[in-house]
Amino acid sequence: MSSSTVWILISILLATVGAVVGFFVRKSIAEAKINGAANEAKRILDEANRDAEALKKEALLEAKDEIHTLRTEAELEIRDRRSELQKQENRLMQKEENLDRKDETLDNRERQLEKKEESLVAKQQQIEELESKVGELVQKQQTELERISNLTREQAKAIILGKVESEVSHEIAVMVKESEVRAKEEADKKAKEILSLAMQRCAADHVAETTVSVVNLPNDEMKGRIIGREGRNIRTLETLTGIDLIIDDTPEAVILSGFDPIRRETARIALDKLVQDGRIHPARIEEMVEKSRREVDEYIREVGEQTTFEVGVHGLHPDLIKILGRLKYRTSYGQNVLKHSMEVAYLTGLMAAELGEDEKLARRAGLLHDIGKAIDHEVEGSHVEIGVELATKYKEHPVVINSIASHHGDTEPTSIIAVLVAAADALSAARPGARSETLENYIRRLEKLEEISESYEGVEKSFAIQAGREVRILVKPDTIDDLEAHRLARDIRKRIENELDYPGHIKVTVIRETRAVEYAK
């Protein structure tokens, strides 16, 4: 054999021996790992068994503790319940003993009442016997007296009663008269105290109302623009408002004259806006007058709300509040009716409080007592009748309605508050300087002029201007033609002559205006 072959054989032999040796080595290593894993598993199992045993013991201990706790709590609860039951039993026994004692007491009282009843029956019998004996004695004495005096019992009784009546009647009359005098003196004294206290606690200011307003101008050139070409601007403003515009030498001022304060205020606002705007022509004047009317209406509503707030009267109907605000622009003998109504409300409330009456209801009645004056120039009837109608319409309290109806003595007052309203009205009106007779007569004459003019069919509106020396009547052109306009002027003139007393003469002007308006599109 060659040496290479020998080396090959040796290499094969060595590889075989190495493979066998490696096999046994790996086998021993694997067996060692298996034995180690088994030992580890046994160790883990032993630890798990020990832990489980410990947990079991711990759980048993906790269960025993919990059972002991529950048993202790149950015993305590049972002990408490037994104690409560024992207390209830004791209370029941005590109540039973009390009932037994009360029963015994009632029995004793019943026996005592029976004894008293027997005693009363015996006494009643004795009294009846005595009454019978007394009656017999009285009858015998009456018979003896009748025999001696020759008078029957009825005759003697009549004589005695007559003497007693004559003596007592005089004494009663004297006592009644003295009581009446004392009552009147005390009533007068109390009334004076109440009135003086109310007057001292009520402070009201009154400013004499005038029939003119002044609009300031930026310069005298504005007067010519207000007059307009051929006077058309001033005529339009006077026709729409029913107010006289007096443009004289007064520097930078125009005077508005009119008896109706609402119209005068509307004209003042409109003219003031026109002066500020600078555009003064008939169409613009109509627009401003209409806008001013809306502003005045809104201001009137605000005045009514402010008045009710100041006086402390709440719950008035919104329409009644607006009518109340109109009183700011009404006067009675020169006295502002709204201020007068507020003063009457305060006085009535103060006097009602002194007498223990409803102060809020008294103020309400005092505030509304002259509500009819707000529209008496628009609706037929006296301001009392109109006020009653308004209060009834808006479902006011019956005391308020009666106070309105009776404050001038037209009907009888049915409550103390109605009497107080009449007294407060007299106090407010009779105060020196509160009213002016001349101004009131003047305003009534102007109102009568407008009333006569507006009573004819076809008349849309009328305005008394020039201090009552002229009345302008606006008629409906579709109802009154030109010939009827002349006839209407004559009829109104005759009625004015027959029904009114006035100095000088009154000019009657009937205005009939027809407008044709078309819009190009």
Swiss-Prot record:
Residues 337-430 form the HD domain. Pfam families: HD, KH_1, RNase_Y_N. InterPro entries: HD/PDEase_dom, HD_domain, HDIG_dom, KH_dom, KH_dom_type_1, KH_dom_type_1_sf, Ribonuclease_Y, RNase_Y_N. CDD domains: HDc, KH-I_RNaseY. One of its GO terms (cellular component) is plasma membrane. One of its GO terms (biological process) is mRNA catabolic process. Keywords: Cell membrane, Endonuclease, Hydrolase, Membrane, Nuclease, RNA-binding, Transmembrane, Transmembrane helix. Residues 211-274 form the KH domain. It is found in: Cell membrane. Residues 87-117 are annotated as: Disordered. Gene3D superfamilies: Hypothetical protein af1432, K Homology domain, type 1. It comes from the Bacteria. Belongs to the RNase Y family. HAMAP family: RNase_Y. This is Ribonuclease Y.
